């Protein structure tokens, strides 16, 4: 969370305090429900508890400010990553028709110095092409790239880590000179 500015932390503190109705330094599922209700949402108690559990790193049953900060920092990181992924998609989608065809994928990977065999191309398409139409649309590309990014972060490579092994490049990373090396 050291990448958040003092201004962002101050804004997030204000937001946290709006949720923390009783001022005890934690957000309970009940407090979360109150705020969501004021925003026109009506989640069930079970849904509220699940939301709290997803953020509650220490298992206390409520959300402390540090946990709240962690959630918001992840959301900010994911937003920036999606912009980079969108740009990478544009690079792959040579004719800008909204789809990456097998030929476009093969062409870009070859230009990145990583030509694909027929089997490797088939594997990449199989992994990404969830609707089975033989090409990759933006949502399919985004899903695969965000999953790769999360996997890399969990493996300790952070958002700037890039491994140069061919197996990694062929499973989602776009190469050292590409805008998607942050993945």
UniProtKB/Swiss-Prot annotation:
Alphabetized SUPFAM superfamilies for the sequence: EF-hand (SSF47473)
Please give one Gene Ontology molecular function term for this protein: enzyme regulator activity
Q: Which residues form the propeptide?
A: 181-183
What is its membrane topology?
A: Lipid-anchor
Residue positions annotated to bind Ca(2+) 2 are: 56, 58, 60, 62, 67
Q: Where in the cell is it found?
A: Membrane
Query: Boundaries of each EF-hand domain copy?
Result: 7-42, 43-78, 80-115, 116-151
Coiled coil ranges (UniProt) are none
Q: Which residues carry this modification: Cysteine methyl ester?
A: 180
Quick one: where is this thing mainly located?
membrane
Q: What PROSITE patterns does the record tag this protein with?
A: EF_HAND_1, EF_HAND_2
Residues annotated to bind Ca(2+) 4: 129, 131, 133, 135, 140
User: Which keywords are on file for this protein?
Assistant: Calcium, Lipoprotein, Membrane, Metal-binding, Methylation, Palmitate, Prenylation, Repeat
Residue numbers with lipid attached (S-palmitoyl cysteine): 173-174
| Region span, Disordered | 154-183
| Covalent lipid sites (S-farnesyl cysteine) | 180
Residue sites binding Ca(2+) 3 per the record: 93, 95, 97, 104
Q: What's this chain's function?
A: Potential calcium sensor.
Q: Which family does it belong to?
A: Belongs to the calmodulin family.
This chain's protein is named Putative calmodulin-like protein 2
Tell me the organism's taxonomic lineage: Eukaryota, Viridiplantae, Streptophyta, Embryophyta, Tracheophyta
């Amino acid at each position: 969370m050291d990448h958040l500015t003092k201004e962002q932390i101050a804004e997030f503190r204000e937001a946290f305090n709006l949720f923390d109705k009783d001022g005890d330094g934690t957000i309970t599922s009940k407090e979360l429900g109150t705020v969501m209700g004021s925003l026109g949402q009506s989640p069930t108690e079970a849904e509220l508890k699940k939301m709290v559990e997803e953020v509650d790193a220490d298992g206390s049953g409520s959300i402390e400010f540090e946990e709240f900060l962690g959630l918001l920092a992840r959301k900010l990181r994911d937003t920036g990553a999606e912009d980079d992924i969108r740009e990478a998609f544009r690079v792959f989608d040579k004719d800008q028709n909204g789809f990456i065809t097998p030929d476009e994928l093969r062409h870009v990977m070859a230009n990145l110095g990583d030509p694909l065999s027929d089997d490797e191309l088939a594997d990449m398409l199989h992994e990404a092409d969830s609707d089975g139409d033989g090409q990759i649309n933006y949502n399919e590309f985004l899903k695969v790239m965000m999953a790769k990014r999360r996997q890399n972060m969990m493996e300790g490579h952070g958002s700037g880590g890039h491994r140069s092994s061919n197996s990694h490049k062929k499973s989602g990373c776009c190469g050292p000179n590409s805008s998607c090396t942050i993945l």
